[in-house]
């Protein structure tokens, strides 16, 4: 596909949602030939992401802080804190669905309206839920985490506490979005969901888990380089990183 030319669009600049005093601009895959599973997978290798069926990549005039990251699944080694996360959450029941269920919406709404009141998706709406998470470009998996019934201080019946929206590509899985019940925030279900996606990637013999954009200067977007080894998309190349820096090593303990 690299020898073919495609039509791309570019947005106007607008205030960045992640870095104050920065202006954001997006490159959009508008060519109809890119609106299929094979092309979407190729776009992911070029640093793109998706929102609904729209594939995009940051193309900001004065900033290149957003850098796509993918974990090398076969070589992944969990840190001590990631091992603790797996142990702490080992009682949960994991299920999978291939469909975006309407029954997920109350959980999504609670997550957005409780934990992300400062975000661009607040307040949550069902239309936003559908348009953002559904996708016709590729196969999807919805990884469900359930709290089992009859535990001490637990629910009276199995309770859905987290959904990890995941795209299936020819060379990996892509972590699109994860939302969870605010009462379970202390469980670190975001980390646990990534670990579950990594395990599933390994089971499916897929070499990569795409985690989205790492933004070092943004606290809520700088966690994605804690899963080693990973590759980071910089200046059109995937550059491998196998060891944490001193600061990251301290965070991972």
UniProtKB/Swiss-Prot annotation:
One of its GO terms (molecular function) is arginyl-tRNA--protein transferase activity. GO terms for biological process: ubiquitin-dependent protein catabolic process via the N-end rule pathway. It holds the Pfam family ATE_C. GO terms for cellular component: cytoplasm. Keywords: Acyltransferase, Cytoplasm, Transferase. Disulfide bonds: none annotated. Its EC number is 2.3.2.29. It is found in: Cytoplasm. SUPFAM superfamilies: Acyl-CoA N-acyltransferases (Nat). It catalyses: N-terminal L-glutamyl-[protein] + L-leucyl-tRNA(Leu) = N-terminal L-leucyl-L-glutamyl-[protein] + tRNA(Leu) + H(+); N-terminal L-aspartyl-[protein] + L-leucyl-tRNA(Leu) = N-terminal L-leucyl-L-aspartyl-[protein] + tRNA(Leu) + H(+). HAMAP family: Bpt. Functions in the N-end rule pathway of protein degradation where it conjugates Leu from its aminoacyl-tRNA to the N-termini of proteins containing an N-terminal aspartate or glutamate. Belongs to the R-transferase family. Bpt subfamily. This is Aspartate/glutamate leucyltransferase. It comes from Colwellia psychrerythraea (strain 34H / ATCC BAA-681). The gene is bpt.
């Amino acid at each position: 596909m690299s020898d073919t030319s495609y039509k791309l669009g570019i947005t106007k600049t607008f205030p960045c949602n992640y870095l104050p005093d920065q202006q954001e601009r997006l490159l959009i895959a508008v060519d109809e030939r890119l609106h299929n599973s094979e092309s979407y997978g190729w776009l992911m290798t070029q640093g793109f992401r998706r929102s609904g069926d729209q594939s995009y990549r940051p193309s900001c005039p004065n900033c290149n802080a957003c850098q796509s990251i993918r974990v090398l699944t076969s070589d992944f080694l969990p840190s001590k804190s990631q091992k603790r996360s797996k142990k702490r959450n080992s009682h949960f029941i994991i299920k999978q669905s291939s469909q975006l269920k309407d029954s997920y919406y109350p959980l999504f709404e609670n997550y957005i309206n409780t934990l992300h009141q400062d975000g661009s998706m607040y307040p949550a709406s069902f239309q936003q839920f559908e348009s953002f998470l559904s996708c016709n470009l590729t196969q999807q998996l919805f990884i469900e985490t359930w709290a089992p019934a009859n535990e001490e201080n637990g629910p009276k019946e199995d309770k859905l506490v987290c959904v990890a929206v995941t795209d299936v590509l020819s060379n990996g899985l892509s972590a699109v979005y994860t939302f969870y019940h605010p009462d379970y925030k202390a469980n670190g279900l975001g980390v646990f969901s990534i670990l579950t996606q990594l395990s599933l990637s390994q089971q499916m013999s897929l070499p990569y888990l795409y985690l989205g954009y790492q933004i070092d200067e943004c606290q809520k977007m700088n966690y994605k380089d804690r899963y080693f080894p990973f590759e980071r998309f910089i200046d059109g190349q995937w550059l491998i990183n196998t060891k944490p820096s001193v600061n990251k090593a301290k965070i991972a303990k």
